[in-house]
């Protein structure tokens, strides 16, 4: 069996890089910085672009980063959007109207800015909508109710795995799309990219890369889609993944 040759690293944010309080451990920060000295590194998150750019800058990452569940690629140094794929306006308006009718909290990214109520939307160039759900069942029902053929829908959880989100992006747009775009612009071979995550919205990314790695606290269906499983967030699992699949092979 040929040795794995790492060419890049993609890391989920909540539950992988940071905890519920948005804290990053020192071992994880050191490991990410060490990896970035060897291969292109990007955060791949469902979060809004400002959050992704903030943590990328903390780590000194300079290559394009992935926000909005793959619908937005950004320059972390300037915060400028390099590439975006909004969902159809009819879908975004329909989803927002229904969420507000039901009294469900959500956030959306419209033209790169976060909106949490209909009054905050401006151009309806919406790349992602993430609606809060009390549990997995409620999340799945929401996705089924509001889905359409022009959308990609996926559940996700917060860093602690306690809160669920129903995520909506344009059809064909996911962290998997973001991984392909990242590989193209950085020149990293997809077969050599290490992707580390803990939630369902990481599954499309796992399907695209050569080394999908699940965090130890990830749900069974996420672990089963991974090639390897590392320690949990509390055990600095991301640092373990970087040591095993980036630093050691390139030492």
Task: Show which residues each predicted segment covers.
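Active-site phosphate-binding/coordination module
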Residues: 20-119
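Mg2+-dependent phosphoryl-transfer enzymes with acidic/Ser/Thr/Gly-rich catalytic loops
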Residues: 3-6, 25, 169, 174-251
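Hydrophobic "anchor" residues on beta-strands that sit immediately upstream
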Residues: 8-10, 64, 194
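Short, structured coil segments at secondary-structure junctions
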Residues: 59-62, 69, 77, 147-149, ...
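Conserved acidic, metal-coordinating active-site core of Asp-based
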Residues: 98, 102-208
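Short active-site oxyanion
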Residues: 38-42, 62-63, 127-129, 191-192, ...
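A short acidic, helix-capping loop that chelates divalent metal ions and anchors anionic groups
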Residues: 74, 81-82, 161-165, 222-223
């Amino acid at each position: 069996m040929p040795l794995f040759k790492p060419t890049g690293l993609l890391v989920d944010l909540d539950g992988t890089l940071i905890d519920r309080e948005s804290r990053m451990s020192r071992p994880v920060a050191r490991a990410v910085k060490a990896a970035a000295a060897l291969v292109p590194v990007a955060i791949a998150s469902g979060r809004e672009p400002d959050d992704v750019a903030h943590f990328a800058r903390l780590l000194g990452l300079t290559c394009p980063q992935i926000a909005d569940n793959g619908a937005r690629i950004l320059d972390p140094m300037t915060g400028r959007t390099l590439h975006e794929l909004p969902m159809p306006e009819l879908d975004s308006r329909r989803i927002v109207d229904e969420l507000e009718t039901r009294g469900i909290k959500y956030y959306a990214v419209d033209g790169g800015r976060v909106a949490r109520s209909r009054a905050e939307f401006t151009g309806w160039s919406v790349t992602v909508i993430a609606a809060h759900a009390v549990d997995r069942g409620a999340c799945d029902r929401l996705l089924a109710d509001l889905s359409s053929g022009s959308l990609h829908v996926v559940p996700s959880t917060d860093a602690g795995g306690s809160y669920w989100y129903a995520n909506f992006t344009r059809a064909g747009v996911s962290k998997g799309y973001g991984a392909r775009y990242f590989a193209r612009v950085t020149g990293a071979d997809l077969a050599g990219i290490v992707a580390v995550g803990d939630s369902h919205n990481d599954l499309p990314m796992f399907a695209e890369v050569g080394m999908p790695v699940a965090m130890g606290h990830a749900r069974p269906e996420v672990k089963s889609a991974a090639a390897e499983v590392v320690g949990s967030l509390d055990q600095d699992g991301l640092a373990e993944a970087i040591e095993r699949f980036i630093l050691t092979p390139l030492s």
